[in-house]
Amino acid sequence: MGLGLIMPVLPTLLRELVPAEQVAGHYGALLSLYALMQVVFAPVLGQLSDAYGRRPVLLASLAGAAVDYMIMASAPVLWVLYIGRLVSGVTGATGAVAASTIADSTGEDSRARWFGYMGACYGAGMIAGPALGGMLGGISAHAPFVAAALLNGFAFLLACILHKETHRSHGGTGKSVRIKPFILFRLDDALRGLAALFAVFFIIQLIGQAPASLWVIYGEDRFQWNTATVGLSLAAFGATHAIFQAFVTGPLSSRLGERRTLLFGMAADATGFVLLAFATQGWMVFPILLLLAAGGVGMPALQAMLSNNVSSNKQGALQGTLTSLTNLSSVAGPLGFTALYSATAGAWNGWVWIVGATLYLICLPILRRPFATSL
């Protein structure tokens, strides 16, 4: 939610620090810096949590984020904001630790459901965060940063009281811990056998960057949406996505199994993309949102497939690798999809959705292969 809080006002804050013509460039650079730091540090935090436990890593990250947001709230010069975003990328790379906590605390038959709940929480944060950030931004461009600091501080206190250690095999060995920040490019032996599934994970995350980067532009160009309609569509997507991940993923995985649930999600998302490409009226998008939300059940199922193939003492490394792949897609995806959109919009601006749907076909031969469980 902290990221969602500051996104609406970050350009406004930049206008206080740099000339107007430089705002867009610095805005893009700050987003890329945040994502790149998560690419590097998500596996580091995951490995640290394997070695020392989930709780201390999570607490340190929450405390660091609270201090960092408060510093950014009072950033007097541009370089302080850059340092702040760099630190935010590091302290915000705790998705791997949270996912590892779920893997520690659940059995193989219920992990997909709990990963779905986690995805729903992210979705809820990305609905409430921008809405609250926009309102606070009307008071001051600095107010959302203060709110983000307070929320992280509150989360730190809650975690101190409520969060119990879930990783039982850490600490007390006296052995040095070897951290591999670039584990994404040199996989641990225990993860190397899952390289094909990692490729599927990356492709699906990459496809997800199409709506993330082009939803507003496409709505304005194709349907002449105004700001209010764009906001309504984003809220509707976030709400339906959260509902499907929270309440559909678990029962569907129990009924179909993780692999078939993943295939169902891919098919739903691809169908939604194709329909979106050919939609001619803005109202058509809203029923299509149900297909896109149904597509969201695939990712928790894939996370469960991967988690079930890794031993308990490698869950942090696994989740760190997945988080790095997610953040790598958030760097590459917007660049690729926006370039494709710019190149084809003059002829027909639906090509980006057709390409996104077609990318799913790459995953099908990989998913036909058998994968062991509980390696």
Language model feature labels by segment:
Residues 42-53, 244-258, 341:
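Helix-to-loop junctions at the C-terminal end of transmembrane segments
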